A protein has these predicted regions:
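A short beta-strand-to-loop transition that corresponds to the Sensor-1 phosphate-sensing loop
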Residues: 64, 285-289, 309-310
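Hydrophobic/aromatic ligand-binding patch that stacks against planar heteroaromatic rings
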Residues: 49-50, 273-274, 297
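P-loop NTPase motor domains
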Residues: 1-8, 15, 63-65, 72-77, ...
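Short glycine-/polar-rich loops that comprise or flank the Walker A/P-loop
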Residues: 54-56, 81, 278-280, 299-303, ...
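Short regulatory helix/loop adjacent to the ATP-binding pocket of P-loop NTPases
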Residues: 69-77, 291-300
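Sensor-1/coupling segment of RecA-like P-loop NTPase cores
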Residues: 275-291
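Glycine-rich phosphate-binding loop of nucleotide-binding enzymes
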Residues: 1-86
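P-loop NTPase motor core of the ASCE superfamily
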Residues: 105-146, 293-380
Length: 380
């Protein structure tokens, strides 16, 4: 409800694409920004839950594995919840291999190129290494068994100093148990299904880089983790291109982790554009408005939710993201003084106001509570 008027605020997330008179955007994408503990995840979860309840379909990328108990805490829709927990267990080997996860052969090869250039740092401008890598990926793409491990084999067949160097570089990533999700020999029979109404994808042992870490400082495990997020998000494109008559949501929690790298930024724009055509909203959940403020993305975001922030630079960035005066002290104070569960909301008509997110049902409050148990008990 509106904090200023006390009146209920009604949201229909799929409305943007229907060209309703008076709306200032036809973008289905949404952004949820704000520092930890302000209610960002709760609001996001609530919106996804109700969209599913009203007939929509959703895929949630859950890098912190906070939604693993939803089958128990949301028993009334448990039969429609599909939790895909990707551990480094042998049964899951290769499930995130680009050649395995993408239905289309060419899409698989394109994603393999994205992932291997990301991991190795080989740029398209590298006239020595790049053509050798692309040639190996193309050969694997045309073979019977397609998998990233076979790219290493293909490079070694080449047996030139450059090909061997690239092969050794890629092979060094496979020494981590965690990497088995990403690398396969192309004989994997298991696949990830997103046929349920509410699909949650979790990757165990994911280690995301710190928000302020530059790309050059990423550790090997962080590079692998971000690679997996890119693979899963690209896989979500297949989900977006399913039945156009059903409203779909691709929910990207901790979105900053891949918005901060070039491949992730390109992918985000691709998801948003596909979503607009196929009646799917891409939801970016992130701590900073800066992550979603690049012009190419910002102009394609419809609903905006901003939760409390105390950092003045962050406050100004958020106000600018909303298109309101960032230097106005009253605006700054409004954002700084938001209580838990309150947020600044910009709707499809461009109106901005403070709303209180109210779950109505107590069981939803417990289901979507992401606070650690100790803190929760203290509050209760």
């Amino acid at each position: 409800y509106s904090v200023d008027t006390g009146r209920n605020v009604y949201l229909q997330p799929s409305l943007a694409s229907q060209g309703v008179k008076g709306t200032v955007t036809n973008a289905l994408a949404s952004a949820f920004v704000g520092s930890l503990g302000g209610g960002k995840s709760f609001c996001n979860n609530l919106l996804v839950y109700y969209s599913v309840l009203f007939g929509g379909q959703a895929v949630i990328l859950d890098p912190k594995s906070e939604r693993g108990n939803w089958k128990e805490t949301l028993p009334e829709i448990a039969h429609e919840i599909n939790i895909v927990n990707l551990t480094s267990d042998k049964d899951n080997a290769g499930l995130l291999d680009p050649f395995v996860i993408m239905k289309d052969k060419e899409d698989g090869a394109t994603l393999a190129k994205e992932i291997l250039t990301f991991l190795t740092g080989i740029s398209t401008r590298d006239g020595d290494k790049f053509p050798v890598l692309i040639s190996a990926i193309s050969n694997v793409s045309e073979s019977e068994h397609r998998g990233l491990l076979n790219v290493i084999t293909e490079l070694r067949k080449e047996n030139t100093p450059i090909a061997n160097h690239i092969a050794n570089h890629i092979a060094s990533f496979t020494n981590y148990d965690f990497a088995h999700l990403l690398f396969s020999d192309g004989t994997v029979k298991n696949t990830i299904s997103l046929d349920n109404q509410l699909n949650i994808i979790q990757v165990a042992d994911l280690v995301l880089p710190d928000k302020d870490t530059t790309f050059n400082e990423y550790t090997t495990i962080e590079l692998l983790s971000v690679s997996m997020l890119i693979v899963i998000s690209t896989f979500a494109l297949d989900f977006i291109h399913s039945d156009r008559s059903i409203f779909k949501i691709v929910d990207l929690d901790e979105a900053w982790a891949f918005l901060n790298v070039a491949q992730g930024e390109t992918l985000s724009n691709k998801l948003v554009r596909a979503g607009r055509a196929m009646q799917a909203g891409v939801y970016f959940v992130t701590q900073s408005a800066y992550d979603v403020s690049k012009e190419s993305l910002k102009n394609n975001i419809g609903l905006k939710f901003a939760f409390r922030s105390t950092d003045i630079n962050e406050i100004k960035q958020t106000l600018e993201f909303f298109g309101i005066d960032k230097d106005d002290e009253n605006n700054q104070k409004r954002l700084r003084d938001l209580e838990n569960g309150q947020c600044l909301l910009q709707d499809l008509y461009g109106r901005v106001g403070v709303v209180q997110i109210h779950p109505v049902f107590e069981e939803l409050l417990h289901a979507f509570d992401t606070r650690p148990p100790v803190q929760r008990n203290e509050v209760e």
